[in-house]
Amino acid sequence: MTRKSVLGEVREVQLAIQLIQLGARLQFLESEVGLSRERLIRLYKEIKGVSPPKGLLPFSTDWYMTWLANIHSSMFYNMYQFMKIHSDEEKVWILIKSYKLYLQQIAAQDSEPILDFTRAYTMVRFFDSDMLQLSTCCRCSGQFVAHAHDHKSGYVCVLCRPPSRAGKARGAKRGAEGEAGALGIEGMGFGVEAAPGGAGFH
């Protein structure tokens, strides 16, 4: 085996480790990592201590429209879009770094992540397939995940017009307020126009 192929394999293993630690499913690993299915399964078991979960990947855009899911999804995708514009790295590494940044922001708010890595990856695919879009709220000017081809005029986000049930469950209101603080215009700009000095973009 040549030196180049050895180093290439090391990079693929490092990539697989990063993805598995973030919660990537086997289907995603097979599509993004240049290792055999058998090696990926062995690596997954070694890191997680269990076999990879079975089942289909999420296929509906509707989940991203629900209250807290939309807040978290919008937070992540704005970060991803910013990183994609300002980085020349491979797409998979932009995805990894954006998701880590999302987790850091959620931890800073003393909250729990709603968006897992699989749904984050699937959402990026939905955007690439023109199934989702970012719509600008006419009240706060934040950019939020919405169905593609929905009317953008007069769009009001889930923070400015939360559902009536929002906050009724114990702890939900506190969590939403934390997310709102992280997502607000005064916090991180909530868009690709955000200044590099905004939250997390140092």
Swiss-Prot record:
Binding residues for Zn(2+): 137, 140, 157, 160
Cofactor binding, note field: Binds 1 zinc ion per subunit.
Pfam families linked to this entry: FlhC
GO MF entry, a single one: zinc ion binding
Cofactor(s) this protein cannot do without: Zn(2+)
Assigned protein family: Belongs to the FlhC family.
Protein name: Flagellar transcriptional regulator FlhC
